A protein has these predicted regions:
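A short beta-strand element within beta-rich, extracytoplasmic domains
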Residues: 335-350
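Low-complexity, Gly/Ser/Thr/Pro- and Asn/Asp-enriched, turn/coil-prone segments
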Residues: 226-320, 382-431
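Catalytic His-Asp segment of secreted/periplasmic serine-dependent ester chemistry enzymes
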Residues: 105-207
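Structural recognition of the beta-strand scaffold that forms the well-ordered cores
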Residues: 1, 50-55, 85-90, 133-136, ...
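Serine-dependent acyl-ester chemistry module
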Residues: 59, 94-115
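Conserved SGNH/GDSL esterase-like catalytic core that processes O-acyl groups on lipids
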Residues: 1-70
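Short, flexible loop/turn segments at beta-strand junctions in immunoglobulin-like
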Residues: 331-334, 396-398
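Short, surface-exposed beta-strand/strand-loop-strand elements in extracellular ectodomains
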Residues: 328, 349-368
Length: 431
C-alpha cells in the first residue's frame, strides 16, 4: 500500500476514514501491478496474508516520539487480519550528501541518523509485542556501506539505489522471514555484478545476526581486479531511471558523492579506475517517455536507449547567464598514459538550438571547451540526425599528477534555456 513519504499518522487517519488514498502495488505472476485509489481495508482483505510489514516515514524513523499512533494501527490491523504476523521495517539512514529536508533533524549526519533509527525501531519492538519480527534493512545498508561500494546505496540521497540497493533490502527480508542464510543464494537480478551480489547478501546476513549494530565487511574492501592496466574501454551511463545492462556502468544520482564508484570495462572486468560526482549538478533528467527505442551509434560505440535518454543536469534560468559547471571526477588513471574521452549529450523533445552544453576536461592541462547543441525535436529528427554532432570528443588527455581528470559540464544561456547535461561517457586508452 503506497503513498510516497507517508507517515504513521497519515496511515492511521486513512485507516479510520477508509480513505481511497493508496496505490496498491502487487506482484502478480512475476509482474508488478499498480491500482490507484485503493483503501487500506481493501488491501488487507485482498489476500490471506501471512505477514504484514509496517514502517515509519524515513525522515521520522529515528524519532520515536512520532510513533504515537502505532499501537492503534497495530490493533486495527490485527482486528482485520488476526492470523497475520506483523513485521517492523527498520529503514536506512540517508546518504552523507543527502539534501532531504529531514536530514538536518539528525544534524545531517548519517551515523547519527542510523543510531536514532536503530534505537527507535528497537523501542517499537519492545513496546509493541504484536510485532513479531524486525526487518533490519537499515543495518544491512549500513553494513554494505563499509564495502568498496561505499556510500552509494541511494539513488537520490534517500531512496535506495534500484539494483543492489533494493536487492540488499530484499535479501534482509528473505533471511529474516525464512530463517535461511541468504549468503550463496543463487537468485539475483542480472543487472547486479556477482561481486556486488556477495556484498548485498553478506550485508543482509550480518544485519540479521546483529540488527542493532554495524558489521564491517572486511572481506569486501576492494573489488577483485585481474589487471591494473586498462585493456578495454569503459562505458558510463548517467541518469536515474533507465539503467543500462552490461557492459555499462550506471551513475544514477546528481548529488555530490564522497564515494568513488569502481568501474568495469566492456569485458565486464573491474578496473582500478573510479568515478564520482564532485559537485555542481542540480538535477537529473529522466527523459520524456516518447523517445524512440533505437540505439545511437556514434564514434564506434552503440549507446542503448537506456544510456541516451536520461542524464545529469546543471540547470539555471534563461537570460540569467551561463550555469555550472557540474563536475565529475575520474580517478586512479595511469599518469604515464593518455586517454580518449567521448561525451554524449542528447535532449529528446527539445529544439536543437534551445539548449547548448559546453564541456572541458581538466587533467595535467585544461582542454579546449567543446559545445554540443543537444536538442532532438521528434522521431523524424532522430532518424535523420547526424549523431557526430551530439558528442564532445577529447583525445590524448593526460591525467594530473594524482591520476585524475575532471569533466566539467556547463549550460550556456541561449535565451531559451540555460541547461547543460551529460548522458554518457566513454573512456579508452589513446593509441
Amino acid at each position: 500500500m503506497y503513498i510516497g513519504g507517508c507517515d504513521l499518522d497519515k496511515h492511521w487517519a486513512n485507516f479510520q476514514s477508509d480513505a481511497a488514498a493508496y496505490e496498491y502495488r502487487k506482484i502478480v505472476k512475476g509482474e508488478k501491478v499498480g491500482k490507484i485509489g485503493y483503501k487500506l481495508s481493501q488491501g488487507l482483505a485482498d489476500e490471506n496474508w501471512d505477514y504484514i510489514s509496517l514502517q515509519q516515514a524515513s525522515g521520522k524513523s529515528g524519532k520515536y516520539e512520532t510513533y504515537t499512533v502505532l499501537a492503534d494501527l497495530i490493533a486495527g490491523i490485527k482486528e482485520r487480519c488476526p492470523k497475520a504476523k506483523l513485521l517492523w521495517h527498520q529503514t536506512w539512514a540517508y546518504a552523507s550528501s543527502s539534501t532531504h529536508e529531514s536530514f538536518p533533524d539528525y544534524d545531517s549526519n548519517q551515523m547519527t541518523m542510523y543510531s536514532s533509527i536503530v534505537t527507535a525501531a528497537r523501542q517499537a519492538m519492545t513496546n509493541h509485542t504484536d510485532l513479531s519480527l524486525l526487518i533490519p534493512s537499515g543495518t544491512a545498508i549500513q553494513n554494505g556501506r563499509t564495502s568498496f561500494l561505499g556510500d552509494a546505496f541511494n539513488r537520490d540521497g534517500y531512496h535506495l539505489e534500484v539494483t543492489y540497493g533494493r536487492y540488499t533490502a530484499a535479501c534482509t527480508c528473505f533471511e529474516m522471514i525464512t530463517g535461511q542464510n541468504v549468503v550463496g543464494n543463487p537468485y539475483a537480478p542480472e543487472t547486479i555484478d556477482p561481486q556486488v551480489v556477495k556484498i548485498a547478501q553478506n550485508a543482509a546476513h550480518y544485519a540479521v545476526q546483529k540488527p542493532d549494530e554495524v558489521t564491517d565487511l572486511v572481506d569486501f574492501k576492494q573489488p577483485e581486479i585481474s589487471d591494473t592496466d586498462l585493456k578495454a574501454p569503459i562505458y558510463i551511463d548517467f541518469g536515474p531511471t533507465s539503467l543500462s545492462a552490461t557492459p555499462w556502468n550506471n551513475i544514477t544520482s546528481h548529488q555530490e558523492s564522497s564515494t568513488t564508484s569502481w568501474i568495469k570495462d566492456v569485458e565486464n572486468n573491474y578496473t582500478n579506475i573510479g568515478v564520482r560526482v564532485l559537485d555542481g549538478f542540480t538535477a537529473t533528467h529522466a527523459g520524456v517517455g516518447s523517445e524512440p527505442a533505437s540505439p545511437v551509434t556514434v564514434d564506434g560505440v552503440e549507446f542503448p536507449l537506456t544510456a541516451w535518454k536520461d542524464g545529469l543536469l546543471v540547470k539555471g534560468e534563461k537570460n540569467q547567464g551561463d550555469v555550472g559547471p557540474g563536475r565529475i571526477e575520474i580517478s586512479q588513471l595511469d599518469v604515464a598514459r593518455k586517454y580518449n574521452f567521448t561525451i554524449l549529450a542528447i535532449r529528446f523533445n527539445g529544439s536543437k538550438d534551445a539548449r547548448i552544453s559546453s564541456y572541458k576536461l581538466v587533467g595535467k592541462t585544461e582542454s579546449a571547451v567543446k559545445e554540443v547543441k543537444t536538442g532532438i525535436k521528434d522521431a523524424a529528427s532522430f532518424a535523420a540526425a547526424n549523431f557526430e554532432e551530439y558528442i564532445a570528443k577529447f583525445e590524448n588527455v593526460e591525467p594530473d599528477s594524482e591520476g585524475k581528470v575532471i569533466v566539467e559540464v556547463k549550460g550556456l544561456d541561449t535565451g531559451s534555456a540555460a541547461e547543460g547535461h551529460i548522458n554518457a561517457l566513454c573512456i579508452s586508452l589513446a593509441k
